[in-house]
Amino acid sequence: MSVDTLGWSAQDWIDFHGKSTPEHSYNTLLSLLKSQKSAPEDPAWISLINEANLAHQWKVLQSKANKQQLPLYGVPIAVKDNIDSKGSPTTAACPAFEYNPSADSTVVALLKDAGAIVIGKTNLDQFATGLVGTRSPYGKTPCVFSDKHVSGGSSAGSASAVGRGIVPIALGTDTAGSGRVPAALNNLIGLKPTKGLFSCSGVVPACKSLDCVSVFAMNLSDAERCFKVMAKPDLENDEYSRPLPSNPLQKYPKNVTIAIPKEVPWYGETENPKLYAKAIENLKVAGASIVTIDFEPLLALARCLYEGAWVAERYEATKDFFATNPPESSLDPTVTSIIKTATKYDAADSFRYEYQRQGILQKVDQTLKDIDVLCVPTCPLNPTFEEVAAEPVLVNSRQGTWTNFVNLADMAALAVPAGFRPDGLPQGVTLIGKKFTDFALLELANRYFKVAFPQGSRTFGKFIDRQVTTKDDELRGPDISPEDSVKLAVVGAHLKGLPLYWQLEKVNATYLGSPKTSKNYKLYALPKTGPILKPGLRRVGEETGSQIQLEVYSVPKENFGEFISMVPEPLGIGSVELESGEWVKSFICEEFGYTQKGTVDITKYGGFKKYIDFLKQEEAKVKKPFETVLIANRGEIAVRIIKTLKKLNIRSVAVYSDPDKYSQHVIDADLGVALNGRTAAETYLDIDKIIKAAKDTNAQAIIPGYGFLSENAEFADKCVEEGIVFVGPSGEAIRKLGLKHSAREIAEKAGVPLVPGSGLVTSAKEAKEIANKLEYPVMVKSTAGGGGIGLQKVDSENEIERVFETVQHQGKAYFGDSGVFLERFVENARHVEIQMMGDGYGKAIAIGERDCSLQRRNQKIIEETPAPNLGETTRTKMRQAAESLGSLLKYKCAGTVEFIYDERRDEFYFLEVNARLQVEHPITEMVTGLDLVEWMLRIAADDAPDFESANIVVTGASIEARLYAENPAKDFRPSPGLLTDVHFPEWARVDTWVSKGTTVSAEYDPTLAKIIVHGKDRNDAIMKMNKALNETVVYGCITNIDYLRSIASSEMFKTAKVATKILDSYDYKPCAFEVTSPGAYTTVQDYPGRVGYWRIGVPPSGPMDAYSFRLANRIVGNHYKAPAIELTLNGPKILFHTETIIAISGGIAACSLNDKPIEQNKPIQVNRGDHLAIGKLSVGCRAYLAIRGGIDVPEYLGSRSTFALGNMGGYNGRVLKLGDVLFLNQPELASSSLPGPAYEPQAPPANLLPKISDDKEWTIGVTCGPHGSPDFFKPESVEEFFSEKWKVHYNSNRFGVRLIGPKPKWARKDGGEGGLHPSNAHDYVYSLGAINFTGDEPVIITSDGPSLGGFVCQAVVPEAELWKVGQVKPGDSIQFVPISYQVARQLKESQDAAIETLEDGKLQTLTSDLILPTYEDPVLVQLPKKSNLSPKVTYRQAGDRYILVEYGENQMDLNIAYRINQLINLVGKHKTVGIVEMSQGVRSVLIEYDGYKISQGALLDTLVAYESEIQFDKNWSIKSKIFKLPLAFEDSKTLECVTRYQETIRSKAPWLPNNVDFVAEVNDITHKDVENMLYSARFLVLGLGDVFLGAPCAVPLDPRHRFLGSKYNPSRTYTKNGVVGIGGMYMCIYAMDSPGGYQLVGRTIPIWDKLKLGSHSQEHPWLLTPFDQVEFYPVSEEELDRFTEDCENGKFPVQVEESVFDHKNYLKWINENIESITEFQKSQGGAKADEFARLIQVANQELESSTTNKSAVEEEYPEDAEMVYSEYSGRFWKPMVSAGDTVTKGDGLVIVEAMKTEMVVPAKKSGKVLKIVHKNGDMVDAGDLVAVIQ
């Protein structure tokens, strides 16, 4: 059915396509095209596209995933014929000038990208020279209202096409008015943008420095739509291109000032002045203020255009053409004469006229300084063809009166209709604004139309009977849409550059401006209750108020709620009145906020920033207490201290141990001093080293923090002796307070209540006697203890002597003091402490109390202030007692007086004084606003604050939770490790030293962070603490975060029923399970795995049998993304710490729960404490354990799957080990990013279970290709592949399944450039499931396999059949059968439906009727070669979800590499429907696609269509980074890889014992020549993933560096990360410890930054991308080891240079060196190549007959031996038994020490010790073998 589309707007077309089918839409466009005729029949069209071009455009458009959302979807457009549009010739209205562009101009490309369809090229004044539209040999285009009147020039044809409604949009160009005059003469909108906003790349220039592409449209909406599409910077291709400002002017004020000319020459015209006058009146009615000015400066500027050297620009654009002496019949004489006048100008004239222009512009600026807009007649006349013929130059000149100056003055213009004359002809006016006012001009035009054409009475083009609807003139403005956002004014810490600005960034806010409020406001600084000062904005009367400076932002509505949630009390969101009278959302302050004590009125400063500046100035006036201070500590306290030092502008000095070399405190400090040691004793406790560091750095003071030397009297005294201030109490005070018996004496003197106890006790016997007198229970304490060490409770006398000796030992070991005393134990005691400060001269002040009762093993867990349930009288007494004690001692600096509080009796007793800053000091700071570290520094400098006038007010409540690296499900054992993901809530205070990439050492305290919140009261603080804990994420080591969440949300904590021992009986229920036996190879996987990184060399991992995995998840009701466990051959044993539901699917094994058999493939309820055992698999190779909710492991690159070889994903990037504790997903937590269960648990019907072979015979369907017969394999070889059975090799795993079977019969003698063996190919990207012939041996590439390689693949196991590959065992037999793509999809879709529904009968399996009778030709389509730059293209089937696209012949060609890059970019630009990933090889690209979104056939059609979209010449260039990397040539680690290969895999080979010698020998060069090549070559990266994780396949750019060579055969099983190899012409850098085959020559830094720690890898973990370049520079092995360590910690500055690879220059260089290059290439061929081939052939024959291969030697133990594994990571301290000793089950075998904790590894059974594996000092990981018992 035909559709009348004439007069349709862009939106009409879009609406039509939205309701139509693609076929009907296409046919409608085709009908429109066929209805048009080109010149001479229709002079508006120079050419029209053909049907093939239209079909091609439509096919490309349909391939785009987002086509329906495109702003110009399916909208036909016309293009002026001086603008390149691929598929149509460009003539510039000169037949002799005609050429066929190879690419679209930038503007046309942008419009096509936005969905537009170009239907033809329009007529113009030749070479865009003229304003009349008559200067073209293709005919004279009339205006759409009269065949006697001109359409205007030079864009006459474009205006006609829109004016007649053929297309809604057409492109013109505008140098001097050609985008505006035709609009006026055809009743259209003519948008002439700010110069440079639209690219002119691909436009035949008229006057290049002034040219603009313009838009003709029927309505404002279409004009704006095009403007937003086309206004994109194109800096690389257009010298005059520039970006639109991010916040362009959107509208003029209501009373916009519009200037009109004082005098308007009309040249005898009488009707047009009336229309102009009417337009001016309408603008007045619309609110404009009209002023009359002298336009002479602008008119003088206009005269420059044709009087000055700008005419020479027209000549510059065409001089080469005119030099060819084109036929005069093709030239317009007027145009030619104008252009040739340029010959009279010389270079000096250019400068003279430019000086003249600049002088005029100065006058113009003065004239327009108070003007917003100019309004002029678009053109004075409506000329007839006869009038133009009579006076062609004069009429043209008059028409340009009001247009010529606009581009010279760098202004924007919009021509709009003004109505009709009595003769029915239209006219218009032009609105002209300053640059970048384009949006504002459109909005002003809209205002004008509403007055000039009320109720939508405006018509468009020739359609005087149709009206423009208000919808079609609707404007959206810039993409910052008010409809989708909230305007928010900020007044305080959210201002740019202040601490909370990040919150605006987080919610994607856009800065709009910096207005002030109206005069009705006051601004206050509220009392500081934390690190950030808060403002309070209050509305008052104008008589007392002022204007306050604001910043206004646009916040997306969907993010506004998130922003509000971060607003702290007493602030809220209300509204504020701006100086303009507009009301916007803003911060307001509750009344109690600005009335509370401590609030400061800061209105006089006019704004918050100025007040902050004032505070900084005041701070600067205060004398710094010290110039340099050394922090004698590490971890979070060192980081926290440095913050204060920075605030006070004091230089900070950090000291660090070897493990802390890259710690945060070292990074933050101004100076760092290495202490050269690992243990605390060797470093942070070494007084001499600390003192030396202070003296070497001229530190005036040392601040010790807490722990280590903070309460060491000797250290304090030593500082004084050395003339260094110790920031803390005197050594004498530390001694008195540190020895608890003397502390009690002091307390007693100070009148502080004491708990009954003893003095120092010297023996266990004496301790026993005293304990009996005190009555049990008693506390045994080390007089020097702290931090929970040297402190134990004793309940009966049979324990007292043992405990006494233990505490005595701990005191001596940790604190160097064995003194011990006893104290009565107070039942249900609370721990309440007072923060005290002393000035050292007898004055002391109690700042507040803290309740620290929540302790585990005397280690504080959660602290809070004020202490709850504490009477004010008691609180006051405690403070007084603390002050009394401090005064008595003349205490100096911070100290904490700790009390035991008996809540029942409301009594407190002295516990001890911590003569240092406490861990929990931040909560006191939060409620007081003080900086206690600053107080300490000032006191230490004898500049103590005035305690009496301090007036400290406690505001609100604060809570701190300590985050420890310890395992709460394993008795809180230390849990060191590498942190792979760390996220803390940004709104809370978090004192920490860790971040992603931090290695938590076993050497020190396990504290990772302190999470601190502040609330208006305790309930509010508890709520915030729970929120903070729920948002906290730490992965890499087990932490107590789940334990903290449990406590903080408990009723016990809410009701403050706390006591120091309450956590001993707290029933913590971890949502976790524990591995008590790991099984053979047990990992965490998810489905579909790590998708989208195959091109980088990151395998998807995921389950090997995805169907069974998904089934297990579905049985328990999990979301499909839920991680579950894959087990191989032998399953694990698991202890559940929580109730849940499980299911086991896949291979068949003996499964039991609490030793009772359970069924597979059914949901099973498990309870807390249940033991699950999965035994050896009797059928199949792998089984799957799903747990309801899924397993909580971090997401890495979009997946939680384990890639153990790459140490990523899953649980710490590895297989599960004994003792691992894995937490389950808790979707209710804010920190959880994993969906919760999606279904109820349900058992599937039996026929949905996978049919796993129990007779070791398998039939597996495969698709043929990508490589087949006759080009790679002989036909009989392919037949044999399907007729024979293949045996599964013993060396099969997740990396690949090796097969044993008939040797292939090759159809070629070698791989050509790809390699010597016929299986070799230039590196390309394999399909997952590909059967890859590595030489003559096939391997099925599986979940953890490599992506990029150089071996052919005969067939691919499709996705639906891959589950079988996951279940085959070594020794099983496989019969491969060919199936079609359609069958493969059918099987896949049935599996998906079965999993989704669990409906009986949904699963379809491979049956004989689905098998093809014979193999298929994998070549789907082949396109012939068109040119050297458009080579042959072969599309190969590569499975049911991949197509391999190969270019050209079997040779490496950089033009092909670039073509592949262009195809990848094209797919990315179009977001092509269904394409998942594009993976680049040397001469090919593997395309992965989603069969649900696009079929194989449809994708082929799209790809074929794309080929004609790719156009370039040999002079292409591409962005390229040049990386300069350090290389240690033949370092020991590189040579170790070779030696290991020789010892374990192949003892003799041509490349052994030295790879470099081999390369040198076969190339007839020296060892040194190879080394020199590596340091002089530059390598170009062609692909990634060779082998794994971004490892590059790179080629030397200098052909003389491309050596003969061969890869290892067989390949290595181990290559060290960072090793560099060369294989023939290619270079590779191994990105992980992995297999490999390149010849090894040296080692560089790691190029895979897993955690993205380095500055060079912030976007992604891989270093290189295709077309990057690599150079090496020499370093020693020692230097490289240091660089590698820096790199692994994100501190190595990689040398990288942003560059462009210029192929033109490269070819020039090749030609300059062609003789030596040719000579080298000849030397590589002939006899040398033949000899090399013979050498490799002989070596391979020797390999086949050799039986001397060695296997790695493993120590063997008797069958009844029991392996004992460590459950902990730490340092092996000492064995408790020796080999030969007899032990019983439970006896201790060895001791592992970590984080101040000694952990015993017990015997699992009774027997004789065969071996203790480690020696003292060894580092032991959890799961490592430590002992063997028989």
From Swiss-Prot:
PANTHER family: CARBOXYLASE:PYRUVATE/ACETYL-COA/PROPIONYL-COA CARBOXYLASE, UREA AMIDOLYASE. GO terms for biological process: urea catabolic process. PROSITE patterns: ATP_GRASP, BC, BIOTIN, BIOTINYL_LIPOYL, CPSASE_1, CPSASE_2. Keywords: ATP-binding, Biotin, Hydrolase, Ligase, Multifunctional enzyme, Nucleotide-binding. Residues 625-1068 form the Biotin carboxylation domain. Residues 744-941 form the ATP-grasp domain. The modification N6-biotinyllysine is found at residue 1796. This is Urea amidolyase. NCBIfam families: allophanate_hyd (TIGR02713), PRK08186.1 (NF006043), urea_amlyse_rel (TIGR00724), urea_carbox (TIGR02712). Involved in uracil catabolism. Hydrolysis of urea to ammonia and CO(2). InterPro entries: AH_C, Allophanate_hydrolase, Amidase_dom, AS_sf, ATP-grasp, BC-like_N, Biotin_BS, Biotin_carboxylase_complex. Belongs to the DUR1,2 family. Its EC number is 6.3.4.6, 3.5.1.54. The gene is DUR1,2. Monomer. Residues 1752-1830 form the Biotinyl-binding domain. ATP binds at residues 115-122, 740, 823, 858.
